[in-house]
């Protein structure tokens, strides 16, 4: 028997589709169904590496965890990773197939319809229910003929759609009605209900609006979800402007850590765990501060989807000089993936993998050289920190080979790669340990490594060490999500929409 399906679409980006999808995944998992998530096409530089080395969006990996299953590439068969304002690396079934402009991708896209359909059908054959997430809005007139993620997917099997609107942004009734008006009659018929998301205050104040909406559209409101602070769910796409547009003041009673906000930053979720630490203030730095401002306790160069371009940006923006000033004043400096490459002396791109720039000088804080290669390394790893034996679990996503000088000790020893026992060095550290880099994304998610490193920074301040923090587990977050469905959705209407087994 083919699986049932339900689809979550939205009136726009950032209205809560990913969270609602995860909540439905967890709710139906707790109801005893075998559930899987699906998103036909995702655009994000925050990716996840599956056990077999494929790349998918992190949101689908999180949703799979909510379902109690391992993520596979079929859950997100097409992933677009922007490498510039005009081009993206196209990843199909977990593997890169090339870098394309929007026009090139639109010409290529018809080949992906069957990939999306086959992936959805494979999941449908294996699970009782597939919870499908759309992207952006289904009513983008200029993009509808290229659709492989919204109504085109819903129409493949007549999947019922729930439309989500964000009342916190204002104008939610106009967004919901306007979105419906821009759909054709077949698409409108697939929309079964609305969700009003991120409501604050007395819900009875919405009663008149809900009655009007239901009468106007002849569609029911499935539920009104409250605004929930600090769900501890990773951002699917770019870092929200709220995190960097208004600079946070330095807190002298806490560790102040600065992440350089590169134009093509990737895997910014690497720093979410740091941000949740009670003794840390995390700052995203988009421009060089004035010379008299106090210096941080740590500067981090993050991953980049376009390392050569972002290295050029560091120089043109003055941030390279700022990092050098921090280093000269004995501030520790760390680099993750592309940031690790930038810390070296030289970056070479003889094949033009990243750009037309064949050679660039790095920041010169570590004695190492990187050569970009055509083959992309994507693998899940287990490792331990050299000298401290803190275990970390993470993943590598890069297209470069870095050769540190023999005198530089490695930062980590990788002990397992895609489930196979190995023994190889990763990263490098300066002789005094003040500058270090690694190819491993997710190292700060390891509680003991994170706390031991933060305690080393605290020691530099003359402060006592702290124990590892008890961050909310995924299970706790999933329970919160399932409770949102149980407490705020019309259960009878939800069962009617999903249908009988």
Question: What label would you give each PLM region?
Answer:
Residues 355-379:
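Conserved P-loop NTPase catalytic core
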Residues 337:
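Catalytic nucleophile serine of serine hydrolases
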Residues 320-325, 348-364:
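An internal, acidic/charged active-site-proximal segment
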Residues 344-345:
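Short glycine-enriched nucleophile-adjacent loop
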Residues 1-325, 332, 370, 374-375, ...:
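Flexible phosphate-sensing "switch/lid" loops adjacent to ATP/NTP-binding sites
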């Amino acid at each position: 028997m083919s699986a049932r399906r339900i689809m979550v679409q939205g009136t726009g980006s950032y209205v809560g589709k990913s969270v609602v999808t995860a909540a439905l995944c967890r709710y139906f998992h707790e109801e005893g169904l075998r559930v899987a998530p699906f998103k036909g096409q995702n655009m994000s530089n925050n990716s996840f590496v599956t056990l077999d080395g494929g790349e998918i969006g992190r949101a689908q990996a999180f949703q799979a965890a909510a379902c109690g299953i391992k993520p596979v590439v079929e859950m997100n068969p097409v992933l677009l990773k922007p490498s510039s304002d005009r081009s993206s690396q196209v990843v199909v079934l977990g593997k890169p197939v090339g870098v394309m402009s929007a026009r090139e991708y639109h010409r290529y896209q018809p080949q992906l319809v069957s990939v999306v359909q086959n992936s959805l059908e494979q999941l449908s054959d294996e699970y009782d229910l597939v919870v499908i997430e759309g992207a952006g809005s289904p009513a983008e007139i200029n993009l509808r003929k290229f659709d492989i993620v919204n109504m085109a997917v819903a129409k493949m099997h007549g999947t019922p759609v729930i439309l989500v609107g964000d009342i916190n942004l204002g104008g939610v009734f106009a967004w919901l009605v306007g979105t419906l008006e821009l759909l054709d009659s077949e698409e409108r018929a697939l929309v079964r209900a609305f969700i009003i998301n991120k409501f604050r205050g007395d819900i009875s104040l919405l009663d008149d609006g809900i009655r009007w909406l239901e009468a106007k559209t002849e569609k029911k409101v499935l539920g009104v979800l409250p605004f929930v602070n600090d769900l501890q769910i990773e951002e699917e796409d770019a870092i929200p402007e709220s995190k960097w547009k208004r600079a946070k003041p330095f807190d002298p009673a806490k560790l102040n850590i600065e992440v350089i906000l590169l134009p093509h930053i990737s895997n910014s979720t690497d720093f979410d765990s740091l941000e949740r630490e009670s003794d840390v203030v995390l700052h995203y730095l988009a421009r060089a501060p004035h010379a008299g401002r106090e210096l941080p306790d740590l500067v981090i160069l993050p991953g980049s989807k376009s390392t050569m371009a972002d290295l050029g940006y560091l120089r043109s923006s003055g941030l390279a000089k700022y990092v050098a000033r921090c280093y000269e004043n004995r501030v520790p400096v760390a680099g993750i993936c592309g940031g690790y490459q930038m810390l070296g002396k030289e970056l070479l791109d003889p094949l033009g993998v990243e750009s037309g720039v064949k050679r660039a000088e790095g920041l010169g804080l570590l004695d190492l050289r990187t050569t970009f290669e055509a083959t992309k390394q994507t693998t899940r790893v287990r490792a331990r920190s050299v000298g401290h034996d803190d275990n970390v679990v993470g993943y590598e996503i890069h297209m470069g080979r870095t050769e540190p000088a023999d005198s530089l000790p490695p930062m980590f020893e990788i002990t397992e790669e895609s489930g196979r026992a190995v023994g190889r060095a990763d990263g490098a550290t300066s002789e005094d340990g003040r500058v270090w880099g690694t190819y491993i994304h997710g190292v700060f998610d390891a509680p003991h490594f994170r706390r031991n490193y933060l305690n080393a920074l605290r020691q530099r301040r003359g402060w006592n060490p702290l124990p590892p923090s008890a961050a909310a587990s995924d299970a706790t977050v999933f329970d919160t999500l399932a409770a949102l469905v149980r407490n705020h959705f019309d259960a009878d209407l939800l069962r009617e929409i999903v249908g009988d087994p």
